[in-house]
Amino acid sequence: MALRFYSHNGCVLTVGAEAFLLQVLVVVVSLHQQPLNVKGVTEKSGCDYFQGNWVYDNSYPLYDTSKCAFIEKEFNCQKNGRPDKLYLKYKWKPSGCDLPRFDGQDFLRRNKGKKIMFVGDSLSLNQWQSLTCMLYTSVPHTAYTDVRRESLSIFTFTEYNVSLMLFRYAFLVDIVAEKIGRVLKLDSIQGSKIWQGADTLIFNSWHWWLHTGRKQPWDYIQEGNKYYKDMDRLAAYEKGLSTWAKWVDSNVDPSRTRVFFQGVSPDHMNGSDWNEPQAKNCQAQKQPVFGSRYSGGPHPAEIKVRNVLSRMVKPVYLLDVTMLSQLRKDGHPSVYGSGGHLDMDCSHWCLAGVPDTWNQILYATLSQH
């Protein structure tokens, strides 16, 4: 009997489906790249892109979302009726330098013939959609294909033969259907078969580790030969990330594949975190937290990510977007997401918006290596 692997959104991948997806991932030998490390570009340029503050810039946003028909409803805040636009006008200013302005044509030329894959949860979807729109509006009217199949989405700029891929695998490790129910296997990473062959990999995982009740997509957690009804979620997260890290160390050739980890994307559900205790969530927030410090302090999952990356042998670049995103309490859909007033969304980000900055940093880093 074929194993059935569950993605976070309920899609089922059988072994047969994996075989189909593997056919899609034709391995293209990339140009040799200088290996990246966890500190990344800061060592090369003397600039830390992740320390700075948000400043008003009337030339922003970088693109008009209405020009991108493929943007998901949940991120399209203006189309969903958000009345304010000031949140669109802020750019990230690193403390010691300027972040290069995004050049979509240059990005496509540099990555011609390449496959860039985002792997993770709906925050990966958020960043993937941001990058597709940033690129598409840089080369308007260019031909593209947008293929969706189960948990894999492939957006290809046909003129450049650049494929932006998204694989929805929220935990990075496997959830497998067994007789006792759905099992989150902290030591198993069979989904990695889909990732092989990509030239650039951008991983993300966090938010789904916290879900309980009806939103929890597993019934048991397995570590080794032991099954648990539950365990400390931060501990489980670190164990799952460690399995992912071992896969990278054992399977990635840094001369052919560049690996990034998208830092933990924060939510804004408690105004005390930004010195507004009267605010119960992100609704009606119209400006960032100004300055370069966030009173809520470091994110606990961020510490786990750093612990895991510090033990890795192969180079991984940390897109350390947590703090710069913590300052953007105004950037979420709130009631202008897919659920409207029935579903407060202070986890995802409006597009155009904060994920565009994540991709600017991704572009700057790739350009320097």
Name these PLM-found stretches.
Residues A2-H369:
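A compositional signature for long Ser/Thr(±Pro)-rich, low-complexity
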